[in-house]
């Protein structure tokens, strides 16, 4: 009598194969979802950091320079033209001290001229377009010409707009003090935060310090409790985005600094 072959090969049923395939598919989908989520979070984090860092650096630079201002900040439009009221506005301009204090005397060789000097052996020479402030004579005027009196000199003859240097008359052996200021500005235009280093001598020259700015009118003068402009402060609202990762739907990552009220240093000048 022949016995049956008990060692014959066995296989999976169709139902078992389908269940195993489904399990593998579910695991693969879960792993893909986790990896994709991680990549999205990484991309978003990088985008946020880039946008935040650029806007933060821009605001810190604006705040630093406003802290150095010696004139009441003035609101301007994107073409650096003055605007009325408390804003908001695209830009702001103000004066900072760039050199001085200097002694001011009438030139001994030409009394009709004035001479500014310092005991500093290596002073920074004022430049045409800088603003000269002589508080004792209420003189605030732009420098139109400057000549050094000798090579390596630490004193110069200075000529002011409208002949204002002729208003300064000092007695022999006496002097008055002057400061040299420069009007600078920050303007948002075409999504760029632009820095203007000298609005008198080179009004069209600027450098871009932040990009992708989404707040076109970030500057204003805050109101005090009575509802009038508080000119002691400048309010800055700056926001930015980084569109690099827009394909992952994180284009609108941004930073917004609302009402960062920045006080200026002092009011040395009476005029803008």
Where is each model-derived feature located?
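Acidic surface patches and DE-rich sequence motifs
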Residues: 8, 74-76, 224
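Aliphatic-rich helix starts adjacent to a transmembrane/signal segment
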Residues: 10-67, 271
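Short linear sequence signals and composition-biased patches located at protein termini or domain-edge surfaces
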Residues: 50, 98, 180-183, 190-272
């Amino acid at each position: 009598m022949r016995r049956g072959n008990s060692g014959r090969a066995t296989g999976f049923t169709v139902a078992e194969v389908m269940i195993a395939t489904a399990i593998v598919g579910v695991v693969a989908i879960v792993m893909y979802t986790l990896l994709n989520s991680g990549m999205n979070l990484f991309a978003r984090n990088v985008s946020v950091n880039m946008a935040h860092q650029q806007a933060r650096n821009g605001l810190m630079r604006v705040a630093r320079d406003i802290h150095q201002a010696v004139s009441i900040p003035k609101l301007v439009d994107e073409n650096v033209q003055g605007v009325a009221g408390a804003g908001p506005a695209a830009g702001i301009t103000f004066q900072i001290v760039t050199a001085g204090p200097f002694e001011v005397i009438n030139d001994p060789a030409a009394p009709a001229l004035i001479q500014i000097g310092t005991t500093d052996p290596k002073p920074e020479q004022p430049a045409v377009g800088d603003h000269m402030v002589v508080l004792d004579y209420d003189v605030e005027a732009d420098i139109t010409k400057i000549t050094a009196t000798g090579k390596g000199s630490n004193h110069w003859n200075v000529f002011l707009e409208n002949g204002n240097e002729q208003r300064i008359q000092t007695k022999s052996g006496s002097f008055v003090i002057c400061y040299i200021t420069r009007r600078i500005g920050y303007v948002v235009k075409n999504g760029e935060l632009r820095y203007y280093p000298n609005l008198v001598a080179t009004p069209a020259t600027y450098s871009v310090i932040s990009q992708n700015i989404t707040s076109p009118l970030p500057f204003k003068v805050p109101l005090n409790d009575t509802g009038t402009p508080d000119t002691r402060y400048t309010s800055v609202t700056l926001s930015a985005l980084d569109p690099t990762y827009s394909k992952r739907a994180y284009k609108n990552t941004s930073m917004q600094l609302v009402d960062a009220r920045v006080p200026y240093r002092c009011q040395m000048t009476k005029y803008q």
